[in-house]
């Protein structure tokens, strides 16, 4: 993948976000999406409960990189890019946590393979967090 191709990839309303959001909505949960006023612009936000949910691509957010998978081309560029993404995610997690938020991050493959498990985690936090 080159940087021109990368720019074409959606960052909002991705397939994995839509899968998770539709399931939550069908269960009666109401939320905001991509809230610009919250650090990291979480994919799903339960404002009153201070819960931020991120649907992370294993590629873009570094799971494959951390597992030692190499990039096919332009390895140095991608290593820097993914390392910055990982660092930014950690900063966002810390900032939100310091401000009383619960942060949930799900890998794309977790949402695809175990949607019910992801929902169960969200439900559990939703029931115990805040109001």
Feature map (PLM): residue ranges:
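Nucleic-acid endo/exonuclease domains
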Residues: 1-131
């Amino acid at each position: 993948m080159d940087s021109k191709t990368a720019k074409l990839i959606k960052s909002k309303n991705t397939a994995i976000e839509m899968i998770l959001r539709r399931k939550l909505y069908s269960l009666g949960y109401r939320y905001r999406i991509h809230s610009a006023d919250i650090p990291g612009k979480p994919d799903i936000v339960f404002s009153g409960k201070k819960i931020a949910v991120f649907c992370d691509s294993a590629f873009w957010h570094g799971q494959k990189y951390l597992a030692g998978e190499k990039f096919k081309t332009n390895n140095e560029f991608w290593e820097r890019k993914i390392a910055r993404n990982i660092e930014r995610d950690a900063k966002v997690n810390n900032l939100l946590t310091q401000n009383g938020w619960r942060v949930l991050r799900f890998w794309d493959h977790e949402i695809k393979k175990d949607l019910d498990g992801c929902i169960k985690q969200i439900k559990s936090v939703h029931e115990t967090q805040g109001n």
